[in-house]
Regions:
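Beta-strand elements within well-structured catalytic alpha/beta cores of enzymes
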Residues: 20, 27, 44-49, 82, ...
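Histidine-centered active-site microenvironments of extracellular/periplasmic hydrolases
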Residues: 1-2, 8-16, 32-89, 101, ...
Length: 271
C-alpha cells in the first residue's frame, strides 16, 4: 500500500488504519462529486472488497473476528463488507443477511441498465461489439430482491475456491461443507484434504470454532451427515457446467504443480 504523504502516520495505528483514513477521504470526494453533478439520485454506489484481511502482515494488514485470512477459505478469507446505496430502490438502513457474491453485481447492474436476461443470452451466444460471447455467468440478478419484489435473494449457495483454484468448500444457506481446510496464513498455509467433509452451521458457529474446540462436535456432526448428499449433488451440477462452458484460461497458481505441468506439456526446443 502506498499512501499519499499527508496520510502517513495519520492515525498512529499503522499502515492499515492510515490507508482506511485515506480511503474514507477518497470515497467522500467521489460522493461529493456525484452531488455536485446532480446525478447521485440516479447512481448505484457499491462499496465492498475482494477478500478478507491479511492478518499475517498485522499491524500493516487488517483484522477480523472470523477465522482465517486472505488466501484461505475460512470465513475470514472470504467474507467481506458489502454496502450499497441505490436511491428509490434500496431502502436506507436496510440490513440483509442473505448470501451474495461480487459475481452477482454484473447481472444486477445490467438488469438495472435495462437487460435482465443477459445471463440467459450469454449461454446461447450474445454479440457485443464485433465479438460474440457464449459463456456461463455464475452471478445472479438481485434487482427484483432490491426492489422488494422478492422476499429472499436468488443466491442460496456459494463455492469457496482458494488462490490455487481448488474447490475447498460449499455453503448452502446456513450450512458450510468443507472438503479441504487450510491451516496457517496465506504465506504458510497447508491444504489438507479431509477424509470426511467438515460440517459447520454458520448461524450457530459463525467463527468456525466448534470443529477444533468443542468436545461434542463429532456427536453433533453425526446427526448432520445428511448434508453430504445434497452437497454432492450441488457440486456435481456446478462442475457439469464446465463441460459445455470450459474455463477460457487456466487459473493462476502459487504452487509448483502448475509449473511442473507446464514443463511437461511444453515441447522441447532442442537447444
Amino acid at each position: 500500500t502506498r499512501l499519499g504523504p499527508k496520510w502517513e502516520n495519520k492515525t498512529g495505528y499503522g499502515l492499515a488504519a492510515d490507508g482506511m483514513a485515506e480511503l474514507d477521504d477518497v470515497v467522500g470526494k467521489v460522493l461529493k462529486k456525484l452531488d455536485e453533478l446532480k446525478i447521485a439520485d440516479n447512481t448505484i454506489i457499491v462499496f465492498t472488497s475482494d477478500n478478507g484481511p491479511e492478518i499475517f502482515t498485522w499491524p500493516d494488514g487488517g483484522n477480523t473476528p472470523f477465522k482465517g485470512e486472505k488466501g484461505t477459505t475460512w470465513e475470514g478469507g472470504m467474507r467481506v463488507p458489502g454496502l450499497a446505496r441505490w436511491p428509490r430502490v434500496i431502502k436506507p438502513g436496510t440490513v440483509v443477511n442473505d448470501i451474495m457474491s461480487n459475481e452477482d453485481w454484473l447481472p444486477t447492474f445490467l438488469a438495472a441498465a435495462g437487460d435482465p436476461d443477459v445471463k440467459a443470452k450469454l449461454t446461447s451466444g450474445m454479440k457485443a461489439g464485433d465479438r460474440t460471447f457464449r459463456v456461463h455467468l455464475d452471478g445472479y440478478n438481485f434487482m427484483p430482491f432490491f426492489k422488494g419484489e422478492q422476499a429472499e435473494g436468488p443466491r442460496q449457495e456459494i463455492f469457496y475456491f482458494d488462490d490455487n483454484a481448488s474447490l475447498n468448500a460449499l455453503r448452502v444457506n446456513d450450512w458450510k461443507i468443507q472438503f479441504k481446510i487450510m491451516e496457517g496464513n496465506i504465506a504458510s498455509a497447508l491444504l489438507k484434504p479431509l477424509n470426511m467433509p467438515q460440517v459447520i452451521n454458520l448461524r450457530q458457529d459463525p467463527f468456525e470454532r466448534f470443529p477444533s474446540e468443542s468436545q461434542m462436535y463429532f456427536r453433533w456432526v453425526g446427526d448432520k451427515l445428511w448434508t453430504f448428499v445434497p452437497a454432492q449433488a450441488i457440486v456435481g451440477q456446478f462442475i457439469a457446467t464446465f463441460n459445455e462452458f470450459p474455463p477460457s484460461q487456466k487459473s493462476g497458481s502459487c504452487s509448483v504443480d502448475q509449473v511442473l505441468d507446464q514443463l511437461q506439456t511444453t515441447p522441447a526446443t532442442g537447444k
